[in-house]
Amino acid sequence: RSLKPNGLFIASMFCENTLQELNYSFIKAEEEICGGMSPRVSPFAKLQALASLMQEINFSLPVADIDRHSVYYKHPSNLLTDLKKLGETNSLLRMNKSFLRKDVLNRMYEIYIDNFSKDGKIVATFEIAWLTGWKYHESQQKPLKRGSGMTNMVEGVKKFE
């Protein structure tokens, strides 16, 4: 309702494999020490699901793209500090509400360092989804009819190979 006809919607958010190393390390540590696990990293939407949502809510010319970034830290505790500053602490309803035990946290650090370190630093993956779409308006350009193009796409692609 707030987007005018022919208005451009732009959004970005963390998605899919963001913090996959942290998630893996927390799960392994908690399973080892507690015999089970409580989600410690919020789940992130899949790009395909976001693209489908853009179509379902009738955006014209929807585009969904993803940027992948690897960020390196001296220690997993530095990553946790940055996440807290970003406001990305866990807000899951199903999460165990008791405090994270220090032995679990320390084991998570060990697992993270053992599995995801390179040149003395740990890696954290961040995937950012970018979404754009136009609110429908009758003045928008319409796609051409199938087969109406003047250039064969296969031939056009061969020029760049």
Question: What name fits each language-model region?
Answer:
Residues S2-L3:
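A generic alpha-to-beta junction signature in SAM-dependent methyltransferases
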